Protein backbone atom coordinates (compact mmCIF):
# COMPACT_ATOMS: atom_id res chain seq x y z
CA UNK A 1 0.00 0.00 0.00
CA UNK A 2 2.79 2.34 -0.84
CA UNK A 3 2.71 5.40 -3.00
CA UNK A 4 -0.82 6.65 -2.32
CA UNK A 5 -1.32 10.18 -1.09
CA UNK A 6 -4.15 10.68 1.41
CA UNK A 7 -7.43 11.71 -0.12
CA UNK A 8 -8.26 15.39 0.37
CA UNK A 9 -11.99 15.91 0.46
CA UNK A 10 -13.02 18.96 -1.52
CA UNK A 11 -15.25 21.57 0.06
CA UNK A 12 -18.86 20.49 -0.36
CA UNK A 13 -17.87 17.03 -1.62
CA UNK A 14 -20.18 14.27 -0.44
CA UNK A 15 -18.79 11.53 1.77
CA UNK A 16 -17.93 8.49 -0.36
CA UNK A 17 -18.22 10.40 -3.63
CA UNK A 18 -17.24 8.59 -6.83
CA UNK A 19 -13.73 10.09 -6.65
CA UNK A 20 -13.34 9.02 -3.03
CA UNK A 21 -14.53 5.49 -3.78
CA UNK A 22 -12.15 5.26 -6.73
CA UNK A 23 -9.28 6.38 -4.47
CA UNK A 24 -9.98 3.54 -2.03
CA UNK A 25 -10.61 1.04 -4.85
CA UNK A 26 -7.13 1.79 -6.22
CA UNK A 27 -5.55 1.44 -2.76
CA UNK A 28 -7.28 -1.90 -2.18
CA UNK A 29 -6.39 -3.25 -5.63
CA UNK A 30 -2.73 -2.27 -5.20
CA UNK A 31 -2.64 -3.85 -1.74
CA UNK A 32 -4.18 -7.02 -3.14
CA UNK A 33 -1.59 -7.14 -5.95
CA UNK A 34 1.25 -6.74 -3.44
CA UNK A 35 -0.09 -9.57 -1.29
CA UNK A 36 -0.59 -11.88 -4.27
CA UNK A 37 2.97 -11.22 -5.45
CA UNK A 38 4.26 -12.01 -1.96
CA UNK A 39 2.30 -15.29 -1.92
CA UNK A 40 3.79 -16.24 -5.29
CA UNK A 41 7.31 -15.41 -4.05
CA UNK A 42 6.79 -17.53 -0.93
CA UNK A 43 5.55 -20.53 -2.88
CA UNK A 44 8.55 -20.26 -5.20
CA UNK A 45 10.93 -19.87 -2.27
CA UNK A 46 9.50 -22.87 -0.45
CA UNK A 47 9.78 -25.02 -3.58
CA UNK A 48 13.38 -23.92 -4.10
CA UNK A 49 14.31 -24.48 -0.45
CA UNK A 50 12.46 -27.77 0.01
CA UNK A 51 15.60 -29.85 0.23
CA UNK A 52 15.85 -33.00 2.27
CA UNK A 53 18.48 -32.17 4.87
CA UNK A 54 20.14 -35.22 6.39
CA UNK A 55 21.10 -33.22 9.48
CA UNK A 56 18.16 -33.11 11.95
CA UNK A 57 19.12 -29.60 13.11
CA UNK A 58 19.07 -28.25 9.56
CA UNK A 59 15.76 -29.98 8.90
CA UNK A 60 14.26 -28.56 12.12
CA UNK A 61 15.43 -25.05 11.21
CA UNK A 62 13.91 -25.35 7.74
CA UNK A 63 10.61 -26.67 9.15
CA UNK A 64 10.51 -23.80 11.64
CA UNK A 65 11.10 -21.25 8.86
CA UNK A 66 8.41 -22.85 6.68
CA UNK A 67 5.98 -22.87 9.59
CA UNK A 68 6.53 -19.15 10.17
CA UNK A 69 6.09 -18.41 6.46
CA UNK A 70 2.88 -20.44 6.33
CA UNK A 71 1.44 -18.60 9.35
CA UNK A 72 2.28 -15.30 7.67
CA UNK A 73 0.63 -16.45 4.43
CA UNK A 74 -2.45 -17.54 6.40
CA UNK A 75 -2.77 -14.03 7.86
CA UNK A 76 -2.35 -12.62 4.37
CA UNK A 77 -5.08 -14.94 3.02
CA UNK A 78 -7.44 -13.60 5.67
CA UNK A 79 -6.45 -10.06 4.72
CA UNK A 80 -7.12 -10.84 1.04
CA UNK A 81 -10.65 -11.91 2.00
CA UNK A 82 -11.11 -8.60 3.84
CA UNK A 83 -9.83 -6.70 0.80
CA UNK A 84 -12.25 -8.56 -1.48
CA UNK A 85 -15.06 -7.80 0.96
CA UNK A 86 -14.13 -4.10 0.98
CA UNK A 87 -14.10 -4.05 -2.84
CA UNK A 88 -17.57 -5.64 -2.82
CA UNK A 89 -18.77 -2.95 -0.38
CA UNK A 90 -17.47 -0.29 -2.76
CA UNK A 91 -19.58 -1.87 -5.50
CA UNK A 92 -22.74 -2.17 -3.38
CA UNK A 93 -22.45 1.33 -1.90
CA UNK A 94 -21.90 0.34 1.73
CA UNK A 95 -18.14 1.06 1.83
CA UNK A 96 -17.14 3.70 4.35
CA UNK A 97 -20.14 3.17 6.62
CA UNK A 98 -20.08 1.37 9.96
CA UNK A 99 -21.54 -2.14 9.78
CA UNK A 100 -23.05 -1.72 13.28
CA UNK A 101 -24.32 1.84 13.33
CA UNK A 102 -24.50 2.88 9.68
CA UNK A 103 -22.52 6.02 10.53
CA UNK A 104 -19.55 7.26 8.51
CA UNK A 105 -16.33 5.46 9.39
CA UNK A 106 -14.33 8.53 8.39
CA UNK A 107 -11.57 9.23 5.90
CA UNK A 108 -8.71 9.16 8.40
CA UNK A 109 -9.67 5.71 9.68
CA UNK A 110 -10.13 4.35 6.15
CA UNK A 111 -6.78 5.77 5.06
CA UNK A 112 -5.17 3.98 8.01
CA UNK A 113 -7.21 0.77 7.60
CA UNK A 114 -8.97 0.60 4.20
CA UNK A 115 -10.66 -2.69 5.14
CA UNK A 116 -12.28 -1.22 8.28
CA UNK A 117 -15.94 -2.11 8.72
CA UNK A 118 -16.55 -0.33 12.02
CA UNK A 119 -16.26 3.27 13.16
CA UNK A 120 -13.66 3.96 15.85
CA UNK A 121 -16.41 4.15 18.48
CA UNK A 122 -18.02 0.86 17.42
CA UNK A 123 -14.62 -0.85 17.32
CA UNK A 124 -13.80 0.42 20.82
CA UNK A 125 -17.17 -0.82 22.12
CA UNK A 126 -16.56 -4.24 20.56
CA UNK A 127 -13.04 -4.47 22.02
CA UNK A 128 -14.30 -3.44 25.46
CA UNK A 129 -17.06 -6.05 25.33
CA UNK A 130 -14.55 -8.72 24.27
CA UNK A 131 -12.22 -7.73 27.11
CA UNK A 132 -15.03 -7.87 29.64
CA UNK A 133 -16.09 -11.25 28.30
CA UNK A 134 -12.51 -12.57 28.55
CA UNK A 135 -12.17 -11.14 32.07
CA UNK A 136 -15.40 -12.92 33.05
CA UNK A 137 -14.11 -16.20 31.57
CA UNK A 138 -10.85 -15.89 33.53
CA UNK A 139 -12.67 -16.06 36.86
Positions of predicted regions on the chain:
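Residues immediately within or flanking Cys/His clusters that coordinate Zn2+
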Residues: 77, 95, 116
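Cys/His-coordinated zinc-binding microdomains
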Residues: 28, 102, 123
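Interaction interfaces in information-processing and related assembly proteins
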Residues: 1-92, 129-139
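Short functional micro-motifs and their immediate structural scaffolds
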Residues: 105-106, 127
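Short cysteine-rich clusters marking metal-coordination/redox-active sites
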Residues: 98-101, 119
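Amphipathic alpha-helical recognition patches that constitute DNA-binding helices
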Residues: 23, 100, 114
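Short Cys/His-rich "knuckle" micro-motifs
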Residues: 108-112
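Cysteine-rich micro-motifs
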Residues: 116-123
Amino acid sequence: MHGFAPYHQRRGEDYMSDDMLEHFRQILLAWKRELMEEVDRTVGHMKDEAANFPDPNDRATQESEFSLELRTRDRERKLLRKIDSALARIEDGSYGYCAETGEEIGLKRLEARPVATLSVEAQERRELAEKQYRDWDDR
